[in-house]
Amino acid sequence: GKVTVDTSTYNLLKSCTELSRLTDGAFDITLGNISDMWGFGTENPPMPDSDELKKSAGKHSYRNIEFDDENTSVCFTDGGFSLDLGAAAKGYAMDMLDSYLRKSGVTSAVVDFGGSILTIGKDNGNSRRISITADETNTLVGTLTVDEGYIATSNGANRYVEHNGKKYIHIIDPSTAYPADSGIKSCTVYSASGLISDALSTAFFVMGEEKTAEFYEKYNIAEYIITRNDGTVSVSDGISADFKAS
């Protein structure tokens, strides 16, 4: 049935669904049940059943969310999925905070929101240098010089489960229902929107370098820094002059 939600929730869900469409489902907010199967954030979860995972893979369930702008209501046209806004809520919150701070007269600020960084204005007239890291040891990949915008990083460093000594990271590839394995260790995205940076850092991590480059050519809505599994780095054209590898 239909659920009427408040405007900000409605806008968040609608924007997320649009980003799911643009990324062909590499970013997908309808993976809640898959994340639950893996048990991220719980103590010693059992290994999920491979048949159950297969059944859940590649569903593109975001297509089953219908929006009614007039009543700000949302309708799920099919069951079998639950929402997980983990890859987007932080970025959206940063967007709200950004507009609140600007309305309050703030002209220069840096807010670090655990992996997502919002920058407003310059630092005494100078651009800011932001450290980009890639893993749980906070290995420095390099520094990015920015004026203002959002920087979000996705990697499997801090959220994972272990089975038989193997780490399974929390970033799920919706096409397989297994953790993403695209040759990328970490992906940082810089754009004018917190939601876009947050969602695309996850999407690019899932898509891998080649598809990310294609997406960049096609839409050009965000810049990226990809750290490959071997530690080498790929930087999008728009920020290559502003990035200094360490």
Tell me what each language-model feature is.
Residues 1-246:
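Mature catalytic core of soluble alpha/beta enzymes
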